[in-house]
C-alpha cells in the first residue's frame, strides 16, 4: 500500500490506575508542568501529519472529564472517540478497535504515560508499518542483564546483544491487529503489549531505534524526569 492511500488512527489506552504511583489520581491525569500528563501525547498526535484521528480509552468514571477538561479544553479535534477502557490494557485496546472507521488501514498504539514521544517517532513507526505491516519503537539494551532466582541470588548473566526494550508508539496493519486481538480473546492469551500479540501470531515486527527520552512514567520521580526532558526541548517549563 502506498503511503498516500493509508488512513491511520492512533489508539491511546489511558485506563490504567497507576498503582505504583500512589495517590488517588490515575497517573495519566497527574500534572506534569501544569498540564495533565495525557495532554502531551495528544499534542503530538494532533500535530502529526501522518495521524488522521485518535481514539482514547479511559476509565468509565473519567469519560466526561476527558471530554471537557482534556479534549475540548485543549482543542484536540482529531479525537474522534472516547471509549470506556477495560480491566487490562489489552481490553482497552480491543474496546477502541471496536469503534474504528472502516476506512482505517493502519493503527498506532501509544502509552498515555509516555509524554515525551515526538512527531518523528510517530512518522518513523508509521512509515515502517506501511512498508512491513508492523513496527515498534524500541531501545537496545545497554545495561548488563542478570537472571535472578527466587532467593535474589544471580543465576546467570544474559547476553544483552539481541535484547531490546520495547516502547511505544507501535504501528500495525489494521487487519493484522484485529485478527490478533480476536484470537487472543478467544484463547485467553494475555500480552503486555500489542507487538507481543503479533509475534504470537507469527507476524514479523520491525524495530525502529527510539530514544532514552521516551520514558514511561510509572513512579513519582519519573514526573520530574519527564518535566526536565520537555523543558529542555523548549528552553522553558513545558
Annotate each language-model stretch with its function.
Residues 12, 29, 38, 96, ...:
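Residue-level signal for inorganic ion chemistry
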